[in-house]
């Protein structure tokens, strides 16, 4: 462990007590405002089509299914009823994706989603997304919500909205897949890792993952099934892995640094890149003693330096999904700009005891 100047530790503590906590408060207010408007919209969607029941609910002070991608960009995952007639398939699928196939062709008429099933028996993410997007547009008109919500004009294939003229919100239909785990497309857990414990791994696999009706990762372009495939999502697993105080605080610090310095034009970086590198850092440093106050600066700087390396190599492997590169769709020029910015922050944190006073 590197020596930590007292000024460095005090500066980080002040940063946490002021900027990190302020960000958390402001984010909560933002999500509350967004969900108030979106919740009203989803009531009208449900009135038009009862199969799309809103799952946007406040539970223990948090809205379920809401995910911040950046300070002004959010996803809302709307969980649908699968009716139990589909099998999960991740063989011969686009990287990071899976398919839902009728378990028995005779059950086609029993499915809640009959008209979205292809001739081959697959539940098409594209068809579900298209129908849902049409319903959202109609619900905005019927609910007279045009002053608060509008469909993004640069997007015609999903329910991406501009809310309160300030925030981008992508409404995504999805399914929960519990008590199963991807066998072919997933590279986690690694047999050599000592983190997390086997009991936590078992808990994560029991809880499962989600399938999102959104475009496949850029690496998947050109695959014939990409429109019908569902993107595999591990948000629930990430929350379990970041449950301990030190790791959770580290992520909050990284996101605060992002909001202040790394939310760059063209979005070369998003929160998902920080989450991914933090997960890799957790594998490198599995012991709880490596995530206490005295070691947190080492962890933060290690993640920043690893991010610089990924930006320079123009590759950021997904933590869970095999063959998925999170930088694949980013321009080289934007990644180079981001690398310089991250390097400046990493150098300041490593060499300047008062760095967090100015960050």
Model-derived regions, located:
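Terminal (often C-terminal) interaction modules
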Residues: 1-20, 33-53, 262-265, 285-359
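N-terminal regions immediately upstream of nucleotidyltransferase
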Residues: 1-74, 78-134, 138-141
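Catalytic cores of NTP-dependent nucleotidyl/adenyl transfer enzymes across multiple folds
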Residues: 66-67, 103-312
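Phenylalanine-focused residue identity feature
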Residues: 3-5, 15, 52, 74, ...
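Acidic carboxylate-rich catalytic motifs and surrounding loops in phosphoryl-/glycosyl-chemistry enzymes
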Residues: 54-61, 145-157, 318-325
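Charged, low-complexity, helix-prone segments enriched in Lys/Glu/Asp/Gln
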Residues: 27-30, 34, 233-237, 341-344
């Amino acid at each position: 462990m590197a020596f930590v100047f007292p000024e460095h530790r005090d500066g980080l503590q002040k940063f946490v007590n002021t900027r990190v906590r302020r960000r958390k408060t402001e984010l909560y207010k933002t999500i509350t405002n967004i969900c108030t408007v979106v919740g009203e919209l989803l009531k009208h969607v449900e009135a038009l089509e009862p199969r799309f029941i809103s799952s946007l609910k406040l539970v223990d002070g948090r809205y379920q299914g809401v995910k911040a991608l950046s300070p002004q960009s959010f996803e809302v995952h709307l969980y649908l009823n699968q009716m139990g007639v589909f099998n999960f398939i991740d063989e011969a699928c686009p990287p990071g994706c899976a398919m839902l196939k009728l378990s028995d062709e005779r059950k086609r008429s029993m499915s809640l989603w009959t008209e979205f099933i292809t001739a081959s028996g697959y539940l098409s993410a594209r068809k579900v997304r298209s129908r849902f997007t049409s319903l959202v547009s109609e619900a905005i008109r019927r609910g007279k919500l045009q002053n608060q919500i509008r469909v993004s004009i640069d997007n015609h294939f999903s329910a991406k909205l501009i809310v309160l003229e300030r925030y981008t919100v992508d409404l995504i239909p999805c399914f929960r897949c519990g008590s199963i785990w991807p066998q072919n497309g997933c590279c986690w857990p690694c047999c050599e890792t000592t983190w997390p414990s086997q009991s936590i791994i078992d808990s994560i696999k029991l809880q499962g993952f989600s399938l999102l009706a959104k475009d496949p990762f850029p690496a998947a372009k050109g695959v014939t099934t990409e429109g019908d495939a569902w993107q595999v999502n591990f948000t629930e697993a990430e929350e379990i892995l970041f449950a301990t105080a030190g790791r959770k605080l580290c992520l909050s610090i990284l996101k605060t640094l992002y909001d202040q310095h790394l939310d760059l034009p063209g979005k070369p970086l998003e929160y998902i890149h920080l989450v991914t590198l933090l997960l890799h850092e957790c594998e490198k440093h599995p012991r709880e003693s490596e995530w206490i106050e005295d070691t947190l600066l080492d962890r933060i700087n290690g993640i920043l330096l690893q991010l610089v390396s990924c930006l320079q190599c123009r590759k950021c492997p997904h933590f869970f999904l095999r063959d998925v590169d999170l930088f694949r769709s980013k321009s080289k020029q934007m990644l180079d700009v981001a690398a310089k910015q991250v390097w400046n922050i990493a150098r300041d944190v490593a060499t300047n005891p008062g760095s967090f006073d100015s960050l």
